[in-house]
C-alpha cells in the first residue's frame, strides 16, 4: 500500500540523514487516530523515527517543510503555491492504470508539471513508487540549489493569479 511505501521512504531517509524530521498532516482528529494506529502497528514507527503528526491545515505543514512527498492531486498545487520542492508519487490499481494509459494522453500527471507543460517536479508512477526512488529524489532536494524551481513556482503562481483576474 502507499502508506507502507511512504513509511519505508521515511525509514530510508532516516538511515541516511538522521537529522531530518518528518511531518504528517492529519486532516482531522479521526484521521489522526488512524495514522497513530497505523504507525503503532508498523513496528512502533512513531517512537523509532522523528515523525510528528499535526492536525489543522496541510498548508501549515507544507510551509514548515523543506521538501514534500505527496500523492498527486490538488495538494501538489498547494505545495507549489507554498513554493516547496516536492516529489509526487501515485500508484493505481493495475487494471485502473491500464485503462488510464489508454484514456489519459497528457505527458504529466502532477498539476505543477501540467501547468508548466514541463517536468519541473519529479513524478513517480506505478513501479517507480518505491522507497529507494522516493528517498533519493527527496534527498536530492536537500543537496541542490532549488532556486530555479522556486522561481518557476512563483511564475506559475503569478500566471494563475492573472488568469483568475480575467474571469
Predicted regions, residues:
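Nucleotide-activated sugar donor-binding and catalytic core shared by glycosyltransferases
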Residues: 2-167
